[in-house]
Amino acid sequence: MVNAALPLLAQLPEAYRAFGPLVDILPLIPVFFLLLAFVWQASVGFR
């Protein structure tokens, strides 16, 4: 029963189809913040 529902849940509904690429990018935002923290600390000399 659960295995039959997984492909259905894996696809976005038609109304949200345009946001597909955005959904692919959103999980990467925390990684960018982590990298930004390292760049910031490197610029201030790791005080």
Swiss-Prot record:
It comes from the Bacteria. GO terms for cellular component: photosystem II reaction center; plasma membrane-derived thylakoid membrane. Keywords: Membrane, Photosynthesis, Photosystem II, Reaction center, Thylakoid, Transmembrane, Transmembrane helix. SUPFAM superfamilies: Photosystem II reaction center protein K, PsbK. It is found in: Cellular thylakoid membrane. It is a single-pass membrane protein. The keyword Thylakoid applies. GO terms for biological process: photosynthesis. The chain crosses the membrane at residues 19-39. PSII is composed of 1 copy each of membrane proteins PsbA, PsbB, PsbC, PsbD, PsbE, PsbF, PsbH, PsbI, PsbJ, PsbK, PsbL, PsbM, PsbT, PsbX, PsbY, PsbZ, Psb30/Ycf12, peripheral proteins PsbO, CyanoQ (PsbQ), PsbU, PsbV and a large number of cofactors. It forms dimeric complexes. HAMAP family: PSII_PsbK (MF_00441). NCBIfam families: PRK02553.1 (NF002715). One of the components of the core complex of photosystem II (PSII). PSII is a light-driven water:plastoquinone oxidoreductase that uses light energy to abstract electrons from H(2)O, generating O(2) and a proton gradient subsequently used for ATP formation. It consists of a core antenna complex that captures photons, and an electron transfer chain that converts photonic excitation into a charge separation. PANTHER family: PHOTOSYSTEM II REACTION CENTER PROTEIN K, PTHR35325. This is Photosystem II reaction center protein K. It comes from Synechococcus sp. (strain RCC307). The lineage of its organism: Bacteria, Bacillati, Cyanobacteriota, Cyanophyceae, Synechococcales.
